[in-house]
């Protein structure tokens, strides 16, 4: 069965004049090369071409050694970890004549209680064998082709959905039937005395899709294949799989199929993605389904609150997604996100995802692990490597029984291999970071500082030319500045603090803000400059436009605002005093840009940005942020900058005042509510400012996937 690769264009990055800040990590910022050479997890090859022995479905002695493996999927149920892959047999027979390749869903069953050394020892035993799940040989002229096993669990049951096609030899010519969906449900049972681990007893293969349903007939859908990766078990017990469907016009759509009765009946979603959007990945977040798809020249994110009856394109919501570049660059060389799961760790609901990036100067594709609570994200580090320059790096994540596993397809000298890793040290780091997030939220809440939408804080932590984020995620770089309590003093004409928030840095993708944010800082101007001097500047850019907003101060003791896009700058003035403490803030709400001094608006401007595109670059800079020839270039003066707070939403004046005043809250009684370490409190409403954003609003970094086009030319 022929397969063609779907490649979407990578986003062309706007080049800016500044160096980027260090990546979101607690340790010192490192180069891309050093990041790649960092610790590697425990790893063991599960599926190896021509080595792994697989038993046929139903048992028997017809053992086979398969030729390649792809599309990993990983689940845990009833004390058994089940690792799945798409296995392929050779396309040549014993006479070296070409035949139609066949494939199947294959699986390892592993005891979830095993220590890593035990697991490796058991799998290495000659008696240890993997299993086939779906496909079978029916005579010499008929083979089942199984594609993209996709799995999820409920209680002790494992649900596996895959695409399937039947190939037949008619007069010496191979032909295919249409791609159909197959579902099989397995019950996990405990091992017998003669077995190394528990196993899964699979039921009969089903066809879950009613092809006479309105959703199929109205769209004239003719072929279906599962997405691969993981399905979702919703909080209400609904089982959901993502899939792709092709219509009579050869257009491909992404959609879902779901069951509300434990798999007895299945329904296809009424709504679909845009045409030619493939490789859906889904997860549940705060009661909604998120679906991320690869389209022709961009990534799209959809949100549904009604099981796919309607899908709303969420522009700028899942901010890790690459969007239309207009560059024509191959996605093979771009960053993208692959595996995605939702888990509860340290009492906090988070998403874990893997992101691929290219190592500088090498044909290697490190796989990075991230954790996000949709408010902030932490870069854990590289967890895998693929030495094939243009190969798809597929992966699956599983968090279960207090352990984190990665199932990864990689290319080695033995071919396409599926490896299992236990991310023990990575999980410890994630737990430590999430604990820090909770502690910081509680601390700032105790000072009446709002934590809803709080992304990062720069205060007293610093070192090696960096101003470190209290939440360990978003460090700033410092040049020619002196450390003071809770911040830095800028003492030279070229002194600056640069905080790169949305950027590509060290082959990693950092996206923290959409078209809504507030940055708040405390400043003291020690002496009067000889000319107009830049204090705080924000540079914003997407693929089609860029914009600068900022605040400067003059020799005649006036504040001046700067709002510059395609129009001429506009300014408004207000006096300032030397050695006096001020709270300064920049705010973006949609296209409305604002500057505040001590909670009072100093001026507003229209940000000439494209709403349909996310902000690919957001840079904040204190001090020497502009070219020296600029009329607002920094003069030699001393400015102290302390306690910088960054929010992914607008703040109102009451909240800004709370940040400045920091009034301790009396200890709460037993009835107080701090959930998951995150403050749940009413945010005062000010007209024109959406200040009642819930915790976790502003969905954050998720996914970019390589598109593997699985629909054959039938």
UniProtKB/Swiss-Prot annotation:
One GO cellular component, as annotated: side of membrane
Signal peptide from the UniProt entry: 1-24
Lipid attachment locations (GPI-anchor amidated alanine): 691
Membrane-topology annotation of the record: Lipid-anchor; GPI-anchor
Glycosylation site residues: 96, 124, 171, 375, 475, 546, 652
Biological processes per GO annotation: ganglioside catabolic process; oligosaccharide catabolic process
InterPro entries linked: ConA-like_dom_sf, Sialidase, Sialidase_fam, Sialidase_sf, Sialidase_trypan, Trans-sialidase_CS, TS_C
Domain of life of the native organism: Eukaryota
Keywords carried by this UniProt record: Cell membrane, Glycoprotein, GPI-anchor, Lipoprotein, Membrane, Repeat, Signal
Amino-acid biosynthesis is among the record's keywords: no
Entry's Gene Ontology molecular function annotations: exo-alpha-sialidase activity
Compartment(s) where it occurs, according to its Swiss-Prot or TrEMBL record: Cell membrane
Pfam families: BNR_3, Tr-sialidase_C, TS_C
Propeptide part(s) removed at maturation, as residue ranges: 692-714
Predominant location category: membrane
Keyword Ribonucleoprotein (UniProt): no
Intervals holding BNR repeats: 258-268, 302-313
Role noted for this protein: Implicated in attachment and penetration of host cells, possibly via a neuraminidase activity.
Protein name, as recorded: 85 kDa surface antigen
Organism: Trypanosoma cruzi
Gene: GP85
